């Protein structure tokens, strides 16, 4: 199934029967990449794979591997595994448009697309809400390897686009973290 947005094929869905492993759907997409849909897949931003009871999404990055497929969750981190629950939120016109237009990042260094995971999406949304509607402070907590740099980059990028925001500062407590963050930001967007 291909979803067109403004006439462009931006989302491709691979559906399998109940009981079929999701990795089969993922592998099918990889075969399509290699043998069938070269031109079409140049436009696709997101892939969805489902067997009805398990549903995952991932960015169009043929070198990413199955480990970069993710469950969608609600803001309380409850997964939407069932296709109908996933579709109800994810394919809502506003949500799908927002995910594609704001929450996919081209990693310039690796020349690959990255899509934020649900907790990153909700964290950035809460940061934007807080900046727009409050003068109170706040914090976002991530564990090691959870994508803190990508979350902070996307939050800084979107906050900087808000009216009345002239500068976004990123404060770190170690020199090596400053170097690492600057390098990653530069890979996400040169000059960031």
Predicted regions and their residues:
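ATP-dependent helicase/translocase motor core
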Residues: 1-191
């Amino acid at each position: 199934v291909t979803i067109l947005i403004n006439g462009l094929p931006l989302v491709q869905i691979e559906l399998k029967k109940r009981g079929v492993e999701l990795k089969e759907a993922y592998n099918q997409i990889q075969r399509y990449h290699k043998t069938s849909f070269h031109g079409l897949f140049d436009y696709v931003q997101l892939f969805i794979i489902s067997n009805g009871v398990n549903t995952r999404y991932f960015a169009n990055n043929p070198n990413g591997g199955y480990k970069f497929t993710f469950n969608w969750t609600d803001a309380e981190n409850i997964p939407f595994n069932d296709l109908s629950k996933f579709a109800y939120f994810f394919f809502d016109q506003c949500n799908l448009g927002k995910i594609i237009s704001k929450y996919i990042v081209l990693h310039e260094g690796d020349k690959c697309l990255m899509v934020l995971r649900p907790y990153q999406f909700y964290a950035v949304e809460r940061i934007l809400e807080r900046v727009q509607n409050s003068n109170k402070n706040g914090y976002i907590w991530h564990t090691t390897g959870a994508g803190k740099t990508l979350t902070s980059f996307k939050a800084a990028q979107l906050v900087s686009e808000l009216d009345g925001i002239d500068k976004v500062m990123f404060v770190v407590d170690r020199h090596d973290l400053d170097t690492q963050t600057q390098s990653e930001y530069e890979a996400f967007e040169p000059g960031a």
